[in-house]
């Protein structure tokens, strides 16, 4: 709370002095209900740096992304250009060489954005960028690592269509997203035009409890955002995994929520709406109908 800031700051200074012999402190701006917007960059050892557009990763639980999409619906062309230029400038400033992601927080007025971090690797959600740009990011990363110069120039990068990714995690949203690894008794992934699935699972395999709970990534692509949303809904209708709980049903319900359809989700979305989403699922479960089947009917 604001009234506690002064005392907390003094306490933190004392702790820093006691632990590290240095009580220097800095303050970061608190951005309430921001959007999580990130830019994919490629940089070679010859100083060539480009960005491949943006991703909106605001639908999260415990600061871990659940649904990602490209491009971000909330960005104007002017803001996209400014944020992309900032991402490229940041990568150049540190002499970066690799594929990477520059992540920002965008405040509610959609005018001011703040650097959060840079992920110096290929990210889980890189597939949505590949779908809207047609650029194979892993191939580009291997070329960079081999010492080759980027062939792509910024003017070569165009964003076409819309892509959405849903992470399928072995976890139970009803139990506070408790990890639920185990044996895959039966598995069926969706398919068809504009659908991509990245996973190593198969019927009969064991999902280990010793690693991340993510079991698969389902991606959908179409010419427009609404078409992509409909395609992803169909993907989650077709997806079947028997053996342990996943978050697939929750993601399916999110795709029907008005805030998601309008592109208005912030990082606070699940905190604000999880109870109602789970309550809907619970009522259907008590009636003997799962949410996916209900909505499909």
PLM regions: where:
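Catalytic cores of soluble metabolic enzymes centered on carboxylation/carboxyl-transfer
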Residues: 87, 127-297
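Conserved metal-phosphate-binding beta-hairpin within the catalytic cores
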Residues: 26-31, 36-43, 95-123
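Flexible glycine-/small-residue-rich
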Residues: 41-43, 54, 106, 120, ...
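Solvent-exposed alpha-helical segments within well-ordered globular domains of core cellular machineries
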Residues: 3-14, 81, 85-92, 116, ...
């Amino acid at each position: 709370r604001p009234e506690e800031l002064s005392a907390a700051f003094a306490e933190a200074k004392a702790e820093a002095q006691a632990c590290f012999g240095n009580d220097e402190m800095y303050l970061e701006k608190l951005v309430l209900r921001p959007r999580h917007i990130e830019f994919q960059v490629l940089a070679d050892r010859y100083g060539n740096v480009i960005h491949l557009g943006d991703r909106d990763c605001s639908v999260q639980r415990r600061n871990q992304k659940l649904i990602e999409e490209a491009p971000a619906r909330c960005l104007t062309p002017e803001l996209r250009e400014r944020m992309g230029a900032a991402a490229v400038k940041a990568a150049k400033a540190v002499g970066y060489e690799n594929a990477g992601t520059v992540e920002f927080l965008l405040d509610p007025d959609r005018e001011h954005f703040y650097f959060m971090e840079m992920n110096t690797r290929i990210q889980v959600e890189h597939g949505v960028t590949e779908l809207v740009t047609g650029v194979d990011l892993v191939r580009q990363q291997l070329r960079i690592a081999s010492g080759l110069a980027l062939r792509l120039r910024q003017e070569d990068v165009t964003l076409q269509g819309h892509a959405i990714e849903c992470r399928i995690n072995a976890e139970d949203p009803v139990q506070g997203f408790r990890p639920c690894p185990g044996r895959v008794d039966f598995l069926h992934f969706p398919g068809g035009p504009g659908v991509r699935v990245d996973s190593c699972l198969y019927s009969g395999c064991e999902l280990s409890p010793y690693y991340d709970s993510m079991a698969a990534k389902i991606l959908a692509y179409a010419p427009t955002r609404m078409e992509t949303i409909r395609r992803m809904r169909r993907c989650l209708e077709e997806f079947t995994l028997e053996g342990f709980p996943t978050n697939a049903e929750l993601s399916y319900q999110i795709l029907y929520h008005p805030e998601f359809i309008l592109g208005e989700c912030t990082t606070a979305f699940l905190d604000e709406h999880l109870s109602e989403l789970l309550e809907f699922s619970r009522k259907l479960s008590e009636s003997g109908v799962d949410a996916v089947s209900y909505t499909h009917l």
